């Protein structure tokens, strides 16, 4: 949808799919419609960057992979600017031709990324809205104007853009547009993402009522694994709510369903303290290896870390601390002295102490923390987090220290 103009289409630069919905709904699978939108794409050579504020890329990198060092891609800056009253007046003048407000689109869109026209209607008191100009890639002139998602007529979009000082001469590759699409009721799926109605048919991604790349990718991983297991007759693979955000997402979809495009947030996970970036390897590596989707070197890398963590935790749990010997050192570190002897693990649990500074005053701990030089900090941090959360790498103790996967807040 661009204004009153409607064109059939599939994924970006692909044709529409016809009759697919009809071919499976006749078996009892239910369907409904949702919408999404996208902003205008701008030629960066036509942008006056001197009238924008630069937002540089991150310098503190946290990589997805735990395996060694990886090349850091060149960081390209984003740029910010704002709409103004003239922009708003132009957009408001075209609301009669907006598919969102002339009855052309009836389906539900995503709550958390509204179109620019929706912002104007919903927040009429706002004099400006922030816009973020983002590069589409390192070797292209195409830029994405985040915050300006729209399905207004192209001439209205362009006229409004030209009232923004930095975009006064902007040239566009394509206008913003809205899309309506079919989705299928995810409560008709098992946790494996196999249909309850048609055996061997798996659903993943936007067709399940989700929005977002990561949401689709996570479902695709689970559906793909289970499709392969289905072909070999093996037991299905399912993730629980306390094991991964993918598990939370799939459980929400299959038990609660959706009435708007679903996006994954940490707030949806009642066990989010267990679902951290720094413990993804402990939660998922062994499962992935058993499924054959993690290579041996990744498994060995994790087992080395796991054994080192267990060694440190075991040492802390059994190493006795005498108050007379440790108190002067604790006072020097600015922490409360002990009233009685304890185990080292009780000191580790103090939030303002860490293994690094404790190892400087307890030589035996320093020896126990011996690990690959490039992984000492990673292993020590994980050991501390594991200790403080009451979790242990021992499966029996681990299962006793966390709540049932099916519990609900």
Describe the function of each predicted region:
Residues 1-290, 294-295, 299-300, 304, ...:
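Residues forming the flavin
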Residues 268, 285-409:
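Extended, charge-enriched "interface" segments that sit outside catalytic cores
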């Amino acid at each position: 949808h661009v204004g009153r103009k409607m064109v059939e289409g599939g994924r970006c630069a692909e044709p529409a799919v016809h009759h697919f919905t009809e071919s499976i709904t006749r078996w009892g699978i239910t369907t409904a419609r949702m919408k999404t939108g996208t902003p205008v794409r701008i030629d960066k050579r036509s942008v006056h960057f001197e009238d924008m504020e630069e937002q540089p890329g991150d310098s503190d990198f946290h990589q997805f992979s735990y395996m060694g060092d990886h090349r850091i891609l060149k960081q390209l800056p984003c740029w910010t600017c704002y709409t103004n009253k003239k922009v708003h007046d132009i957009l408001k003048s075209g609301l009669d031709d907006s598919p969102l407000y002339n009855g052309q689109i009836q389906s539900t869109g995503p709550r958390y990324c509204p179109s620019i026209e929706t912002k104007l209607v919903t927040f009429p008191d706002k004099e400006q809205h922030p816009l973020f100009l983002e590069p589409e890639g390192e070797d292209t002139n195409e830029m994405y104007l985040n915050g300006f998602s729209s399905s207004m007529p192209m001439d209205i979009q362009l006229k409004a853009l030209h009232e923004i000082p930095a975009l006064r001469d902007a040239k566009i590759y394509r206008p913003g547009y809205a899309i309506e699409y079919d989705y299928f009721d995810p409560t008709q799926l098992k946790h494996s993402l196999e249909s309850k109605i048609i055996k061997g048919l798996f659903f993943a991604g936007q067709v399940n009522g989700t929005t977002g790349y990561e949401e689709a990718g996570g479902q695709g991983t689970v559906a793909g694994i289970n499709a392969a297991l289905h072909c070999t007759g093996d037991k299905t693979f399912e993730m629980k709510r306390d094991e991964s955000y993918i598990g939370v997402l799939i459980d929400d979809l299959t038990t609660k369903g959706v009435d708007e495009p679903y996006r994954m947030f940490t707030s949806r996970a009642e066990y989010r303290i267990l679902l951290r970036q720094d413990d993804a390897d402990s939660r998922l590596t062994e499962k992935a290896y058993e499924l054959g989707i993690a290579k041996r070197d990744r498994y060995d890398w994790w087992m080395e870390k796991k054994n080192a963590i267990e060694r440190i935790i075991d040492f802390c749990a059994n190493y006795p601390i005498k108050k007379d010997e440790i108190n002067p050192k604790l006072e020097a570190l600015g922490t409360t002295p002990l009233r009685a002897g304890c185990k080292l693990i009780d000191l580790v649990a103090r939030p303002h102490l860490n293994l690094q500074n404790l190892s400087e005053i307890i030589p035996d701990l320093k020896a126990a923390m011996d690990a690959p030089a490039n992984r000492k900090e990673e292993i020590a941090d994980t050991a501390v987090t594991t200790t403080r959360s009451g979790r242990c790498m021992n499966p029996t103790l681990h299962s006793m220290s966390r709540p049932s996967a099916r519990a609900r807040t």
